[in-house]
């Protein structure tokens, strides 16, 4: 009986894992790719073509003794002014993450002078786009073929697999 319970549990878990999961995951961007957060890199070009969505992360790698990550307003961003940051994202390790948890424009710069060498990044964070609409399923009567098939196959498989397992295990 214990094997039967374990088998039922395994089958149910297999079905749950095989079920389609929403394709919504946060993405981690390493700022500057393999050049990281350093002077003389054009971060505007790095950000081009990327879509930043709510929940994504910006991962900064830098020398913590020479640089930092400050969030500022647009005016301070344009003038490389770090006197009144909105937020200091630096945690001291030189491996810091900015979580994009609001739909807004983020203006980030190095407040230790690196901004004048190009160490500034502006990203616009958007809401996730809606999932693509699936193709319409032809209905037969009031129940679609796919729904009817799923309603039939899941209960049948829940009982068929354990029965097959029992037969196979008795043969050995």
UniProtKB/Swiss-Prot annotation:
Provide any one GO MF term from the record.
electron transfer activity
What's the short name of a Pfam family annotated to this entry? Cu_bind_like
**CDD domains attached to this UniProt entry:** Phytocyanin_like_1
Q: Which residues cross the membrane?
A: none
Q: Gene Ontology terms, cellular component aspect?
A: plant-type vacuole; plasma membrane; plastid; side of membrane
Q: Which residues are glycosylated?
A: 42, 73, 88, 101
Family matches, as Gene3D superfamilies = Cupredoxins - blue copper proteins
**Lipidation feature positions (GPI-anchor amidated glycine):** 141
In terms of superkingdom, the source organism counts as: Eukaryota
Presence of the UniProt keyword NAD in the record: no
Positions annotated as propeptide: 142-172
Q: Where would you find this protein in the cell?
A: Cell membrane
Q: Is-annotated flag, keyword Metal-binding?
A: no
Where would I find the Phytocyanin domain in this sequence? 27-127
Provide the topology term for how it sits in the membrane. Lipid-anchor; GPI-anchor
Q: Where is the signal peptide?
A: 1-26
Which pairs are disulfide-linked?
A: 80-115
> Which keywords label this protein?
Cell membrane, Disulfide bond, Glycoprotein, GPI-anchor, Lipoprotein, Membrane, Signal
Q: Which PANTHER family match?
A: BLUE COPPER PROTEIN, EARLY NODULIN-LIKE PROTEIN 17
Q: What does this protein do?
A: May act as a carbohydrate transporter.
The Swiss-Prot or TrEMBL record describes its family as follows:
Belongs to the early nodulin-like (ENODL) family.
Q: What is the protein named?
A: Early nodulin-like protein 17
């Amino acid at each position: 009986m214990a094997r039967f319970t374990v088998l039922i549990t395994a089958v149910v878990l297999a079905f749950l894992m095989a079920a389609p999961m929403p394709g919504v995951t946060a993405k981690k961007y390493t700022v500057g790719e393999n050049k990281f957060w350093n002077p003389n890199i054009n971060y505007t070009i790095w950000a081009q073509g990327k879509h930043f969505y709510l929940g994504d992360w910006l991962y900064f790698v830098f020398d913590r003794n020479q640089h930092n990550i400050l969030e500022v307003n647009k005016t301070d961003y344009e003038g490389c002014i770090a006197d009144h940051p909105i937020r200091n994202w630096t945690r001291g390790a030189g491996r810091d993450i900015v979580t994009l948890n609001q739909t807004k424009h983020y203006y980030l710069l190095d407040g230790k002078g690196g901004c004048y060498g190009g160490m500034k990044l502006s990203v616009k964070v958007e809401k996730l786009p809606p999932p693509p609409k699936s193709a319409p399923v032809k209905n037969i009567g009031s129940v679609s073929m796919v729904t009817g098939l799923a309603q039939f196959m899941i209960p049948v498989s829940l009982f068929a697999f354990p029965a097959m397992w029992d037969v196979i295990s008795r043969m050995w």
